Amino acid sequence: MSALTVEACGPGTTVQDAGRTGFRRFGVSTAGAMDRLALALANVLVGNHPGTAAVEFTLVGGRFRTVDTTVAVAAVGAFLTVDGRPIPAGSGALAGPGASIAVGPARGGVYAYLAVGGGIDSPPAMGSRSVHRRSAIGGGPLGPGDMLPLGPDGADVPRRLPLPEPTTGPIRLMFGPQDDPFTDAALAALTATDWTVMPRSDRMGCRLDGAVLPHARGFNIVSDGVVPGSVQVPGDGRPIVLMRDCQTTGGYPKIATVIGPDLDRLAQVPPGGTVRFAAVARTEAVAAAAALRQRIDGLAALARPAGADPSSEDLLALNLIGGVVDATAVG
């Protein structure tokens, strides 16, 4: 059987794919990868569909071993080695039977991904292999000794891709659906404050500190639907942005909603990091979501075999002139 054995990993390591859609009306959370573009990049590097199940790491990496198989592997967001051999960022590699696969801590963010050719073939639950920890739907966190079955065609030719530059700028949101219970001062403070991500943030919610957002009419409402991206404000006035593992209903007013593509960016801000929000119109939010889908769908066409020479298009897409100095000014 093609499989990976877990030898070591951090407590926040789970299997995630594109998420569990269509079941929120039954009280089932979406789950899924916290950074969908990073998941897609890792999968395309090993020849998988962008939304295929992979291993998601939270801050801490892990160590794995292949069982009776040769598979393509790739990591995005962390340093990867196969039998001690460093694998360049943006490139997949083949791992033979019994190979040791090591993933380092997350670099420049919170979440990193290990994709394996053929994908993680754990039993699907409601159309997804994503783990939702609080309900145990899809299983639970990974630990030493766990064995991850792999799908077929895992030894596909590994690929390489120029990794995109990190997107900068404020996190975009739309006011509402319940911005009316807040004072004008609260609405202004939401986009004028440098917010700090608190250590208690997790896959369920990103807790922020930096200002108190006053309620105009109390903080309790009749519970209604929430979605990933909803910005709830409880009684202490400090906002909580709901993330992929969030519940399906809530009883705090929702001052705003973070747009989908920027929720992935927010997920990668580490505890102690700062974020700023900017309000956008619905048309911009819809356009941003469409652009992310188009970007993910187009990744496979950009991929090249990992050992091939770079094309002229690849070279033009990369910044190859780093560290230039003026020699005449030295000495």
Model-derived regions, located:
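Conserved "landmark" site that anchors the functional core of diverse proteins
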Residues: M1-G331
